[in-house]
A protein has these predicted regions:
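Acidic catalytic/metal-coordinating carboxylates
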Residues: 41, 67-73
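Two-component/phosphorelay signaling modules centered on CheY-like receiver
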Residues: 18-37
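Acidic, metal-coordinating helix/loop segments flanking the phosphotransfer/catalytic sites
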Residues: 38-56
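Alpha4 helix (beta4-alpha4-beta5 surface) of REC/receiver domains from two-component response regulators
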Residues: 25, 70, 84, 95-110, ...
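Conserved acidic carboxylate
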Residues: 15
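C-terminal output helix
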Residues: 98, 116-129, 133, 137
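CheY-like receiver
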Residues: 130-161
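The feature encodes the CheY-like receiver
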Residues: 64-65, 92, 96
Length: 161
C-alpha cells in the first residue's frame, strides 16, 4: 500500500456519539488532517455537504435521526446532492458480513468496524484513495463498482489470434 498525505483533505465525520466523533477527529488530526467538519446525523450531514467541499465522508451506520444508510442513499441518489461521487467509509459496531454487503449495496466505498485505531482508519482511507473503482449508474444502483476482483472466465477461448 502506498503512503498518502491526507493533510489537505476535507473530511466530514457523521456520528451521533460526541465521544466517538471526537475520537475520529483526534485520529484525523494526528494523521495531519486540518479540515474536518462534523454532523450528528444524516440530515445534518447533507446540509454540511452543501457548503463544505468534502473529499471523504466517514459515516456511522446507526444514529439517532437519519441513519448512515439513509444518508449514503441520499448522497448517492438525491438530485440535489452536491457530490454523488464522494468517497464514503462506513463505520459501525455491527460487523456482520451481511451488513457490510448492505452497506456496499447502497454505495459505500469501504466499511470499518469499531473500535477504530489510527492504523485501521488510515488503512481504509488509503484503500479508498488507491482503489479508484468506476461508478455504476444503473436503474436500481448508483455508486462504486461493487465487484472487488475480476472474475476469471472459465469457458473456451473463442477470440481469434
Amino acid at each position: 500500500m502506498a503512503e498518502f498525505d491526507i493533510s489537505r483533505m476535507n473530511i466530514l465525520i457523521v456520528e451521533d456519539n460526541l465521544h466517538f466523533r471526537t475520537h475520529i477527529r483526534t485520529i484525523l488530526q494526528t494523521l495531519g488532517v486540518e479540515s474536518v467538519e462534523e454532523a450528528r446525523d444524516g440530515a445534518e450531514a447533507f446540509e454540511v455537504l452543501l457548503s463544505f467541499d468534502a473529499d471523504l465522508a466517514i459515516i456511522d451506520w446507526k444514529m439517532d435521526g437519519q441513519n448512515g444508510l439513509d444518508c449514503v442513499r441520499r448522497i448517492r441518489n438525491d438530485e440535489d446532492s452536491p457530490n454523488r461521487f464522494l468517497p464514503i467509509i462506513m463505520v459501525t459496531g455491527y460487523t456482520e458480513e451481511s451488513l457490510a454487503r448492505d452497506a456496499r449495496d447502497i454505495g459505500v466505498n469501504d466499511f470499518l468496524g469499531k473500535p477504530i485505531s489510527a492504523k485501521s482508519l488510515m488503512s481504509r482511507i488509503a484503500a479508498v484513495l488507491e482503489d479508484k473503482r468506476e461508478f455504476i449508474d444503473a436503474p436500481d444502483y448508483f455508486g462504486p463498482d461493487r465487484r472487488r476482483s475480476q472474475q476469471e472466465y472459465m469457458g473456451e477461448e473463442r477470440r481469434k489470434k
